[in-house]
Amino acid sequence: MSLLIRGATVVTHEESYRADVLCANGLIQAIGENLETPSGCDVLDGGGQYLMPGGIDPHTHMQLPFMGTVASEDFFSGTAAGLAGGTTSIIDFVIPNPRQSLLEAFHTWRGWAQKSAADYGFHVAITWWSDEVAREMGELVAQHGVNSFKHFMAYKNAIMAADDTLVASFERCLELGAVPTVHAENGELVFHLQQKLLAQGLTGPEAHPLSRPPQVEGEAASRAIRIAETLGTPLYLVHISSREALDEIAYARAKGQPVYGEVLAGHLLLDDSVYRHPDWATAAGYVMSPPFRPVEHQEALWRGLQSGNLHTTATDHCCFCAEQKAMGRDDFSKIPNGTAGIEDRMALLWDAGVNSGRLSMHEFVALTSTNTAKIFNLFPRKGAIRVGADADLVLWDPQGSRTLSAATHHQRVDFNIFEGRTVRGIPSHTISQGKLLWAAGDLRAEPGAGRYVERPAYPSVYEVLGRRAERQRPVAVER
């Protein structure tokens, strides 16, 4: 099966040019002007549109067991919704229970993901520590293509990683050539503030952001960055939502530390007023962690993208329907944390970023695809338009528009946190493994078509770290 995209403007993270692109056997086979059409090849007219690398969402949680329930989106429905939005690959999370084998949890998630409609990989969370955890980390890297490990600094009495676990796991990541990632919130402070607010009679969603103020995120970001700096590891911080956390990243990067920041579309576009909505269910629908912040943090995050201190855009796609959110009707701390966004991420970033002049098209490609591929060692297989790369592409109509709504989205959740927002600039066609799976409103996703993608250890940042460590190696004093 082959597909020729004719006459589009190819846009990568570095350049743009007019060309035809031929896809066959799941790969990009040729790029050039006026390519011949092979016998039996389908032809897609790309005139007037941009052809870009398919989106990579580095942060999703499909069918996650969490807070007494299970996320409503499974791996097929979630990746299918992603294809409708231009996202062709995800990196989800394996989250073992404390004391559970990492390998056992990994195989459980692999089983769930077999129905995926798009390519996928996994970060693996470190929720406890032992010699066995260290051994299994090595096996995951060497035999299963895992090159990143997640650490939750929040969720006390559940999956929170204390400092001793952070130190041990970061050190093990360094030995393995893996990237440690963190959810940066001070779990002790969050727990304390939750109990304090509940004792004061604040039980509704409006208390959620009060229990997780920006300082809580800033402190945890600073602590994780200092641990990484001391040990000499890279660090990737997920869903940065506050100016305080961003300032910590900027300060570290100004000193040359390899720290990377991720931001969600929601944190760029929504503010904390949503938690004060008079309808409880509407307000509860926005409960996620970190919470949406006051408006001034949004502008700081946009500046973080523009300055290169934030590197990827994600969704933290973790859907809970209204009935599930109601589990916390009398206690905000029991509202399942999570929102949707995999279908809307790219259109939102284009509309609010490119159309507004905040971002160039090339920055858009970097932030939605290429940077993630580089950080997690998928480039140039993904995140690129070049011969030999995976034929994961999105044909983008800069003049097309749609209104975001639960009534029309493909995400398996009964509300949309961006309800009623109209975006200009949308995917007209999405191509995964050279197959046209989203075509002008027609979703052709196939259960099980997605592949597990192994990510090799030692992404490019380790080249610099290795030389730096050698230069700074301590030398004993001879006496």
UniProtKB/Swiss-Prot annotation:
Subunit structure: Homotetramer.
Binding positions (substrate): Y155, S289, N337
Catalytic activity: 5,6-dihydrouracil + H2O = 3-(carbamoylamino)propanoate + H(+)
Residues binding Zn(2+) 2, per UniProt: K150, H183, H239
Protein family per UniProt: Belongs to the metallo-dependent hydrolases superfamily. Hydantoinase/dihydropyrimidinase family.
Summary of the function given for this chain in its UniProt record: Catalyzes the hydrolysis of dihydropyrimidines and of the structurally related DL-5-mono-substituted hydantoins, to produce N-carbamoyl-D-amino acids.
Gene: dht
Record-given protein name: D-hydantoinase/dihydropyrimidinase
Binding site for Zn(2+) 1: H59, H61, K150, D316
Pfam families per UniProt: Amidohydro_1
